[in-house]
């Protein structure tokens, strides 16, 4: 094993340290025998030319200088800035003055860019409000109206109003929005539901998929594919008929399955992996293999300590962001070290459950429209996926779903992602019963269910609990007849959120729930955010079902 640091001997240049604490995995020696047909990075079909460049692409060495110098505490701040003039003119000016003795990078940025608008100070919580009243009054605070696209800004304009999570997140996010919508429906905000439905359909039409969020730097990846669940919600709440979205669902499916038909066993392309028996399963992916604009310095530091080619690490970090679980022991080879991330080598249980739902939704809506051939085709696809999941991702010995390391050909860790097959109706009753026992003994706490069993310092691990996981567990177990467990999780979670609200008068992104004393969840690449979209949505829906805690 190598363990050394390489330092630049020239003191006038930037010091470079590379941690080579890396031992070649014997399984990786086999990779040359596997053909992974990776696409060229930065190839995004259907992307309008005016929005093709991310801030890192547009500002080149200026972008790297700003991020490396840490002139903003949050790496996301500069990518969210909008230029006051043509970016090319800014870059030319920067190149002319950057070596001047009195050059001030912070002043240069402030003179040439509009800093992101901060909304958090606009709202002061009323301690007299109940939890329900607090959430209902927050919807307008978290709503952003459509606006003209500021030239060369990273923010992608949307045609209708939308909800943002809150805090540092001033754009809409794909899978967050579904859980936010649950609360909007409960609050009677059908107007916002319609707007968000139109926005997501518009993004599919214009970009061929729903990006991670409405920023140029998010266009190279998506997030957990929950549009089929959104469509189901629209239908249930009378917002929009499901039939009108059939073409959009098919387009999203094509995005996730791109390249599948040309793969041979043990081959992967973008999101698709052909398993040894010829079946198809999916993984998370990002078409770029560069540091994320919004976490540029953090990614560079992580890659520096990996001992692997940086582009591989960047791809896995980006794919981890696409998973929504950024980050978790689920994606780490060494659970205590983010630099060991291997997201693209895992077949995630939640992703494949969501795609099962997508296939089933296309089949169901096709049946409503009398498209029998399409219905039959997608019923077969859903059935084939369920069979493949049971072969590769179901741990029969322990009665749990687990992710699958397709390169090592072995099961990976157990986490709360295992409840998604129940939420989408993919499990059988025996699997649901056995999984319930595992969740009770391994993930359930007096505060809700943990993201995982492992304490790694990452935010999607123990001791944290997250609203979307609670909702899917509650509804998933109740769908299979385990009302006792579903209701217990619901009561525990409502108690957690309400107790914290009574003390702090706010809802937050994640909660520390391991010891029965609710407090702020830790971990992650950024400070804890309050607001918070999907917590508000899930809790508001639960209040409608269970009453105020």
Curated annotation (Swiss-Prot):
Enzyme Commission designation: 3.2.1.28
Annotated keywords: Cytoplasm, Glycosidase, Hydrolase
Residues of the active site: 326, 509
Xref: InterPro entries: 6-hairpin_glycosidase_sf, 6hp_glycosidase-like_sf, Cyt_trehalase, Glyco_hydro_37, Glyco_hydro_37_CS
Top-level taxon in the UniProt lineage: Bacteria
The keyword Hydrolase is assigned to this record: yes
Quaternary structure and interacting proteins, as annotated: Monomer.
Function: Hydrolyzes trehalose to glucose. Could be involved, in cells returning to low osmolarity conditions, in the utilization of the accumulated cytoplasmic trehalose, which was synthesized in response to high osmolarity.
Protein name per Swiss-Prot or TrEMBL: Cytoplasmic trehalase
Annotated organism of origin: Escherichia coli O1:K1 / APEC
Taxon lineage: Bacteria, Pseudomonadati, Pseudomonadota, Gammaproteobacteria, Enterobacterales
């Amino acid at each position: 094993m190598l363990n050394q640091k390489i330092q630049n001997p020239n003191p006038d240049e930037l010091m470079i340290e590379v941690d080579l604490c890396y031992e070649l995995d014997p399984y990786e020696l086999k990779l040359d025998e596997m053909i992974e047909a990776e696409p060229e990075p930065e190839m995004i079909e259907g992307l309008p030319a005016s929005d093709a460049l991310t801030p890192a692409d547009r500002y080149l060495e200026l972008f790297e200088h700003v991020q490396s110098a840490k002139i903003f505490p949050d790496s996301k701040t500069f990518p969210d800035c909008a230029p006051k003039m043509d970016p090319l003119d800014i870059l030319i000016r920067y190149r002319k003055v950057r070596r001047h003795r009195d050059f001030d990078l912070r002043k240069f940025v402030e003179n040439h860019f509009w800093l992101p608008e901060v909304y958090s100070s606009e709202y002061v919580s009323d301690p007299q409000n109940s939890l329900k009243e607090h959430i209902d009054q927050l919807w307008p605070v978290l709503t952003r109206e459509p606006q003209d696209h500021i030239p060369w800004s990273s923010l992608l304009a949307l045609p209708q109003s939308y909800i943002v999570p809150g805090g540092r997140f001033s754009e809409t996010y794909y899978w967050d929005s579904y859980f936010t919508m649950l609360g909007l429906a409960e609050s009677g905000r059908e107007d916002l539901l319609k707007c968000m439905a139109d926005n997501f359909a518009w993004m599919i039409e214009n970009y061929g998929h729903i990006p991670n969020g409405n920023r140029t730097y998010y266009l190279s990846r998506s997030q957990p594919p929950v549009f089929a669940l959104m469509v189901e919600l629209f239908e249930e709440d009378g917002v929009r008929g499901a039939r009108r979205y059939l073409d959009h669902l098919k387009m999203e499916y094509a995005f996730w399955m791109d390249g599948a038909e040309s793969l041979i066993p043990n081959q992967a392309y973008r999101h698709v992996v052909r398993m040894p028996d010829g079946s198809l399963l999916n993984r998370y992916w990002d078409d770029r293999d560069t540091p994320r604009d919004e976490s540029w310095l953090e990614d560079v530091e992580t890659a520096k300590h990996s001992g692997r080619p940086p582009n591989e690490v960047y791809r896995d970090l980006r794919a981890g962001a696409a998973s929504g679980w950024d980050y978790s022991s689920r994606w780490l080879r060494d659970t205590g070290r983010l630099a060991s991330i291997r997201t693209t080598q895992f077949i995630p249980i939640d992703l494949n459950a969501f795609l099962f739902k997508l296939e089933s939704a296309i089949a169901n809506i096709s049946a409503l429209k009398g498209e029998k051939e399409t219905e039959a085709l997608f019923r077969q696809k859903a059935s084939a996926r369920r069979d493949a999941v049971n072969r590769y991702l179901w741990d029969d010995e322990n009665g749990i779903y687990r992710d699958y390391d397709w390169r090592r050909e072995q099961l990976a860790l157990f986490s709360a992602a295992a409840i998604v097959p129940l939420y989408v109706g993919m499990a059988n009753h025996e699997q649901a019963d056995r999984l319930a026992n595992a969740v009770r003994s391994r993930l359930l706490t007096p505060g809700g269910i943990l993201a995982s069993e492992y304490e790694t310092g990452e935010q999607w691990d123990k001791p944290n609990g997250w609203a979307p996981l609670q909702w899917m567990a509650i509804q998933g177990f109740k769908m299979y007849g385990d009302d006792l467990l579903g209701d217990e999780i619901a009561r525990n979670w409502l108690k957690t959120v309400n107790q914290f609200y009574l003390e702090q008068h706010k809802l937050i992104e994640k909660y520390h729930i391991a010891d029965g004393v609710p407090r702020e969840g830790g971990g992650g690449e950024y400070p804890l955010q309050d607001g918070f979209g999907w917590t508000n949505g899930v809790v508001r829906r639960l209040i409608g079902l269970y009453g105020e805690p």
